[in-house]
Amino acid sequence: MRQRTIVCPLIQNDGAYLLCKMADDRGVFPGQWALSGGGVEPGERIEEALRREIREELGEQLLLTEITPWTFSDDIRTKTYADGRKEEIYMIYLIFDCVSANRDVKINEEFQDYAWVKPEDLVHYDLNVATRKTLRLKGLL
């Protein structure tokens, strides 16, 4: 089984948290709301990977003013590829508390939507298991 280390920013701006809705046809959590983030590439440092993933998925214009390592978790997930293939992967999630100076987001093709969500509204979103676990651990659910 393949192993992946995933960096996940929990991005907050003015009391709201950034959630991204995954594309319906790909990824580990198709069609569900999640934190952004992605895999650490060979030879890449953890914070470099986090900043790269944010640029790739959320755009250059989202400015982070704070990045603080927070917690980690792991599990086994089935990834669905655009061509329909499936793969089981052992996932290690490194989760960071982040604060952004703005809400200027430009999502890439991995996502179909995004939202800045106040903690009291998180229950109204179809969150994937990993995001639900993270937000519960943070005391937001």
From Swiss-Prot:
Disulfide bond positions: none
A Pfam family per the record: NUDIX
InterPro entries: Nucleoside_triphosphatase_NudI, Nudix_hydrolase, NUDIX_hydrolase-like_dom_sf, NUDIX_hydrolase_CS, NUDIX_hydrolase_dom
Single annotated GO MF: dUTP diphosphatase activity
Catalytic activity: a ribonucleoside 5'-triphosphate + H2O = a ribonucleoside 5'-phosphate + diphosphate + H(+); a 2'-deoxyribonucleoside 5'-triphosphate + H2O = a 2'-deoxyribonucleoside 5'-phosphate + diphosphate + H(+); dUTP + H2O = dUMP + diphosphate + H(+); dTTP + H2O = dTMP + diphosphate + H(+)
Keywords on record: Hydrolase, Magnesium
NCBIfam families: PRK15472.1
Function: Catalyzes the hydrolysis of nucleoside triphosphates, with a preference for pyrimidine deoxynucleoside triphosphates (dUTP, dTTP and dCTP).
Record note on quaternary structure: Monomer.
UniProt protein name: Nucleoside triphosphatase NudI
Originating organism: Escherichia coli O6:H1 (strain CFT073 / ATCC 700928 / UPEC)
Gene: nudI
